[in-house]
Amino acid sequence: VVGSVNEDILRRHQIRETIKTHLERERQLFARGIKVLSLFFIDHVDSYRIYGKDTAEKGKFARMFEEEYQRALQELMSTFKDTAYTRFLSNPKNAPENIHDGYFSIDKKGKNVESKNKEGENEERGFDLIMKDKERLLSQSCPIRFIFSHSALKEGWDNPNVFQICTLKDTSNEIKKRQEVGRGMRLCVNDKGERQDADVLGDHVFDTNILTVIASESYDDFAKKLQTDMAEACASRPVVVTATLFADQLAPVSYTHLRAHET
């Protein structure tokens, strides 16, 4: 029981930090028409939503989220100077119970199911549910800004505006960790669908496209190592591509490969 209580305290702290980081990032990007999304990966579906025969109740993470979001607004609202943003936050449409949702596996009857026993099969069935709202999630007219998922969303979801990833679980599977962290490694887009890359932002591309991982210690160590590995891998890459880069670089041509691209 003590262990469970201590873990709940840790998870609540992670949720709180994710919300605060989200609000600060959202404050910075709101006027530029860039919607900020946060993604939570959870251990079991019933940690977020508990299904009865004909009803569904909020799980502990959903309750924690709404409590901590309301608390964060009370603490931070007076520090926000952008009146358009404060009106956005105060809009009843953006009340705590409306801004989060869970995307999980679904059975043939369209009901959410616990996927821990048939993880691969059920995650695959859940991808379609996530993809249906992919573009709508990027609009401020959609109140959902916080997403809870059981799966790693590996090849089924590619939303560019995930700025925070919070892992409310522990795992030693490094492949799955890479899949989860990879959900936030995208160049964001604004409300016009314009990708915020170096052509648009110049050097500020690095100030805008920042991913924050709020994690337990195992994920924190992993994220730092991944960042180091990526920095080392990119260090030797040329900043500008010129003709001299390809001097004396001869490579065999694969006609099978070319045909594959043409078809």
Each language-model region and where it sits:
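Phosphate/oxyanion-binding loops and surfaces in catalytic or ligand/nucleic-acid-binding neighborhoods
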Residues: E68-A72, R183, L187, A233
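Extracytoplasmic/secreted cell-surface and envelope-processing proteins
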Residues: R49, F222-K224
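Conserved RecA-like P-loop NTPase helicase motor core
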Residues: N117, E121-D221
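Short, glycine/acidic-rich hinge or "gate" loops at secondary-structure transitions
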Residues: A31-V36, T79-F88, G193-V205, E232, ...
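Intrinsically disordered, low-complexity intracellular terminal segments
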Residues: P238-Y255
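Conserved small/polar residues in nucleotide/adenosyl-binding loops
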Residues: T256-T263
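Short secondary-structure boundary/capping segments
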Residues: G52-K60, F163-K169, E180-G184, L226-E232
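Conserved C-terminal RecA-like helicase domain
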Residues: V1-I147, E155, T171-S172
